[in-house]
Amino acid sequence: MKKSSKLILILILSTILLFCLGILYLECANEDKVAILGYHSILPSKINDSGDNLVVDAEKFEKELKLLKKLGYHTMTLDEFYCWKNGECKKKENSVLITFDDGYKNNYDYAFEILKKYDMNAVVFCVGAYMEANSDIHMNIETIEKAKEEYPNIEFASHSYNLHFHSDKTYEIVDNDAKKMNKLLETSYYAYPFGDYNEDYVKALKDNDYDMAFTFGPSKEHRKADLSDNNYKVPRLNISNDMSIIKFLLRLILPM
């Protein structure tokens, strides 16, 4: 009897939880905010032994895309997001923006095919120095050009030429870096390395014809993007390997 009472209680609580999530989902469907999902590496679980939470299992990534598809989410392009952000056009109901940082080759090897399977758009923020390095870890220029042909749903934008480990980000340093990157990749969108920026950084990007820049991480307002955000300080939501599907869902529907 005790066991059956516990089971009934669990069922009641589960029903209440699902009902509450449903209400939240309906309320947030048309809100003027967009969840920008931030990924890095994608690897099949059988070879994902790094212990780094930024390396997401490919199977987990696919489950997240399945959920987006099931809930009717539209994955925006950068131009769609920019158009909405500037108040020039309306976004589709339940819109998200999927991003990847650093330009890992495993994005090409695993993530792109999964995105294509579910007919979803995404953007990869590439590091110029890695593009020219021809390593096995990051996509080089040749791989990126190949990806553009094979996966027209994938966009490529700037993650700096080589500012990840530059502690002193003065106007001159950022300006020179941006000019170097512009020779490799034609884009007007940018993601700050580690989400770090200052006003000199922002000015240098503006002077190099970047229209929008994205931040990252809890210290950089870990929340959805909204219309009031500065175009050069757009927040993103980090997606990690230890994140449950429920937590992922909450990232999508909570009004924050």
For each predicted feature, which ranges?
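Metal-dependent polysaccharide deacetylase catalytic core of the NodB/CE4 family, i.e.
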Residues: L37-P44, G51, N94-V96, K105, ...
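Short beta-strand and adjacent tight-turn residues that come in two discontinuous sequence segments
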Residues: F125, A213-T215
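Noncatalytic alpha-helical scaffolds and linker/capping helices
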Residues: D101-D102
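Short secondary-structure boundary segments
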Residues: F194, F216-P218
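Short phosphate-binding/catalytic loops that engage adenosine nucleotides
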Residues: Y73, M120, Y210
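Binuclear metal-dependent phosphoesterase catalytic core
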Residues: K220-D226, N230-M256
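Extracellular/periplasmic catalytic domains that process cell-envelope and extracellular macromolecules
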Residues: C28-E31, C89-K92, K117, K148-Y151, ...
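N-terminal pre-catalytic segment of deacetylase/amide-hydrolase enzymes
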Residues: K2-V96, N241-M256
